[in-house]
């Protein structure tokens, strides 16, 4: 039997054409998740060595404080993991050693022995304000120092609720819940991409768990988690959204929920909404993209309403905290001042500051036009496009940190860990499902 266009029905080339958009035959294409055997000692020993070298150099070059505490613990953890993987050829032991010494040990040490960094303090305070006043932001008259500002969107307060409800010590610290959320979300992302997820494949569950542990144990995520930076859960939610839209055309709603949660927490997630929507328009049609965008926006709106019910009474506080403060347009400036092009231009004076903001806006318009004129065709292309967009944003922003580049690095790492086997010859990030009655299409 053949279709009207002459392609055999049921063949990998068959596609549903709606409004000119060509949709893949999702029954025959699935995301490739790294198999459990690919995470063996032979592949991970060099990575542990690279991680150890990075942590050692970071310990020497860092200015001290929480960063150096993490670097010293992490160096020991990665060296131990590399030695254990090389000597005993195990997977679980070295991974758990790296996670324990690069994340758990320095995090607990910093919680019990060292002062918290600004991020956990801000999140915990916002949760207390939410419970007391229904608004996680201080009013303009109370913004006496830069520490008084809250540059996060309202839903970020959920990580501070344990502290606000009276938990103290490790269980009440924001860093514990940021790390737990990141591990769970990354495991869900890898599990969502497993090729035999629907069949309850034990190997897929194992691969998803160990892939998540390896990702979290890498310096890209473990350093910000240990010192209390809020970016890793946003990265994990973005990876989960990519896994959903790669897995099936029926999952953009789930992807929309994931991106919606991230967008309700931090503005750095907003570009992901635009990039994924553009990819869905090109791949699946405008209707699927509209469902994804609607799910994202509704989720964001609901979460903001729930986590900041008093916000409508003081909208100026929201603008002061999440718009003007990150752009350096308030009386007290953010300490995010890494010597990148945007900050260097902004530091030349008021004219330079306005020029930096204008250049950032021009870059945003340019990326938007690029998405419309040449949208990404698949998930790997979308991940790369998002990495480029975020890199431009962090380079050109008037207030920025080197640590923000964890976003593009993590996205490229996610794309690499879920890439297609080159031997399949299929689209990047996809591989043909096995069919005993028909050879794979090259």
Predicted segments — roles?
Residues 2-242, 280-405, 415-421:
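Primarily membrane-embedded glycan-assembly and transfer machineries that use lipid-linked glycans
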Residues 257-281, 305, 398-404:
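Transmembrane helices and adjacent periplasmic/lumenal helix-loop junctions
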Residues 88, 245-255, 280-290, 416-442:
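Membrane-interface junctions at the ends of membrane-embedded or membrane-associated helices
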Residues 237, 253-257, 273, 388:
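The feature captures the transmembrane alpha-helix scaffold of multi-pass secondary transporters
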Residues 242, 253, 260:
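Metal-dependent active-site segment of extracytoplasmic phospho-/sulfohydrolases and closely related
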